């Protein structure tokens, strides 16, 4: 290849990268409105305070008419007061500000306190949602991400991705009581109240493991067929099923707990990260980095069909459902403009 040809290739590559960056920036600056949906009504946006030029929201959690939202970029945790029939206003939003890289947030129902994981500081912060003031900072294993409440033993379980560990925290004493080697990089987990066990995705080994918090150990593991890079997980306890989204091959798989195998798989939008199962409506919602909200109807434990695919906004990868109202909340990534949550209500 001549120098001119080599230079032309380099310039073309640089131009292509810049074009992608410009298009991406335009998408983040202009959230627009979601595409039309057959089964959902778009109610509007919950606008959050602008804390940085670029805002990437991570986990969402609905608890007692409050929506908690974390910001991976600023580290802020937002508390949004929810109202039936109307969108929250600016006055309904309060902020717990701290160091960057907030990820998971969970509420301990016994104390009412909130626990939030922070991957840059390698800590779990405890704060009081009543006044949004800090209570304690607990050092944990490297790269804490997902955080979950285990109601049977009344424990908080946080996973460290780089450390490949689960850390168990007693919320009453606000102290670590155990660390559990997981054998891979953990993502989402789901608690099974019938067995009092935690099911845990390992994204680097495409594995599902069972974590027994009483024994402080992994007790079972299975390879996940049809699933590369398992991320989000939701449980259907009544039918003994797990719904798992797979980030590296854009799939939703259904895992049968009793039969110990993947029973089905469905293609979904790019970079899927979150999945929620609304047992009341028998609907499965998934979102991913490509900004597509997929809605599946569970016709029976063995049969599913796609009932909606809604184009949202690039980076809209995280969601939550208020099971009392069936409202669906999706967090958007944003550049320059205020971060926001898209709100949907199922149509009758």
Predicted regions mapped to residue ranges:
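Short, Lys/Arg-rich N-terminal segment immediately upstream of the first membrane anchor
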Residues: 1-10
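Predominantly soluble domains enriched in secretory-pathway, periplasmic, or organellar proteins
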Residues: 5-6, 17, 21-348
